[in-house]
Design a protein with these regions (language model features):
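Positively charged n-region of N-terminal signal peptides that target proteins for export
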Residues: 1-4
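C-terminal motif of bacterial Sec signal peptides marking the signal peptidase cleavage site
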Residues: 13-16
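Short coil/turn motif common to extracellular beta-sandwich-like domains
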Residues: 24-28, 43-45
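A short, amphipathic beta-strand motif
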Residues: 27-35
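Short, ordered, surface-exposed loop/turn motifs in non-cytosolic proteins
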Residues: 37-72
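Short, surface-exposed beta-strand/beta-hairpin micro-motifs centered on an aromatic residue
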Residues: 79-88
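A short tyrosine-centered beta-strand micro-motif
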Residues: 92-98
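Structured interaction patches on ligand/partner-binding surfaces of diverse proteins
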Residues: 100-130, 137
């Protein structure tokens, strides 16, 4: 009887453990990365769009929490259609980001992150993230 009680206590202890966000699940996060090429209209001074382009070969990073200051846990390089996906994820909060490049007034190039947040609330789910749109000035 004492052994049965110990086994039941251990079983309850293991079943009560909530696994954190990360790999080991059955859900997917997917999305796309676009570049938008713009230029400054000389007659109006406004920024006008030249064209959209799918951004292939762009790294998209994932953090297994909603904390943007943590180091990334995994990355995915977009395919020829600018698509990425992270598979085998558990329920939880996730942060995705990619880098956009920019030039300041002194012609110094620098990268800055663009963040997206998503929550997986059920197993076996496909979760789409709003597209990353990276502006490229001409």
């Amino acid at each position: 009887m004492k052994n049965l009680l110990i086994i039941c206590a251990i079983a309850v202890g293991f079943s009560a453990c909530e696994k954190p966000a990360g790999e080991g699940g059955t859900s997917v996060i997917e999305g796309q990365v676009y570049k938008i090429h713009t230029f400054q209209n000389s007659s109006t001074g406004a920024m006008d769009t030249l064209y959209y382009q799918l951004d292939s070969g762009k790294d998209v990073f994932i953090i297994y929490s909603d904390n943007e200051t943590e180091v990334y846990d995994d990355k995915f390089e977009t395919d020829y259609n600018g698509r990425y996906n992270f598979e085998y994820l558990r329920k939880g909060d996730y942060t995705l980001y990619t880098y956009a490049d920019s030039i300041d007034v002194n012609n110094v190039n620098y990268d800055y992150p663009i963040f997206k947040h998503i929550k997986i609330s059920s197993n076996n789910s496909n979760n789409s993230v709003e597209d990353f749109v990276i502006e490229k000035n001409q």
